[in-house]
Regions:
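HIT superfamily nucleotide-processing domains
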Residues: 1-98
Length: 98
């Protein structure tokens, strides 16, 4: 947790490492966030994703890598009306869309 984001492990992990990263502002999805968040909030979220990846040992710097995913609206599979990113890693994550 920092000034801009809150992060925690998913209670129903889909991969070996599965964390959620949530901006502290109230934003419905990435569209809402990109249109209404401050520059500091946007930078804070992007940097927050990288910080969490490093803390979990899955950043590209460690030669591993990860997938950051955010579902947007009905066709994108969004179930919770709060912007959040899923961070998957610790193993190969497979194809982009099944």
């Amino acid at each position: 947790e920092d000034e801009f984001v809150l992060s925690f492990h998913d209670i129903n992990p889909q991969k070996k490492i599965h964390a959620l990263i949530i901006p502290k502002g109230r934003y419905i999805d990435l569209d809402d966030f990109s249109q209404n968040a401050s520059v500091n909030e946007i930078v804070g979220l992007i940097k927050g994703i990288n910080i969490v990846a490093k803390k979990l040992g899955i950043s590209a710097d460690e030669g591993k890598g990860y997938r950051a995913l955010s579902n947007i609206s009905d066709h994108g599979g969004q179930e919770v009306p709060q912007l959040h990113f899923h961070l998957f890693g610790g193993e190969k994550v497979g194809k982009m869309v099944s």
